[in-house]
Amino acid sequence: MKKIVVLFVSMLVLATTASAGNDKPIQVSQLPQTAQQFIKKYFGDRKVAFAKKESDFRKSYEIAFKNGDKIEFDRKGEWTDIDCKYSAVPTGIIPAPIAKYVADNYPDNKIVQIERDTRSTEVKLDNRMEIKFDKQHRVIEMDF
């Protein structure tokens, strides 16, 4: 029994060490061109604190700005998650139907985080409400 516990702990330590080594600091110039253009267009006035390439299961990239905002990109340089800690997500990024829904239903709130994948887009408002939309930008879930 003792050998099994030691083996399990050893495997856990190795797995943790291996995955920790998959994050690699990079320069912004090493991001895919699509990501570089996106940052320049929507976040050009912000200073980058760090950029890293993650190679866990799928290659991805993360940028953190000195003001606390973060952007995650997929391997092609398309954004997957934008988290603006102290400001609104730039309106040009938000799909028009989602921006309209939020403006119509929550006029006093702003979108501070947006996350998308192949099936849905989820936004978080500054009042902590989360709204999930399907591919056609219809509301499918809300979390208060």
Go through the PLM ranges and name each one.
Residues 1-23:
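Bacterial Sec-dependent N-terminal signal peptides
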Residues 21-144:
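Interaction-mediating elements
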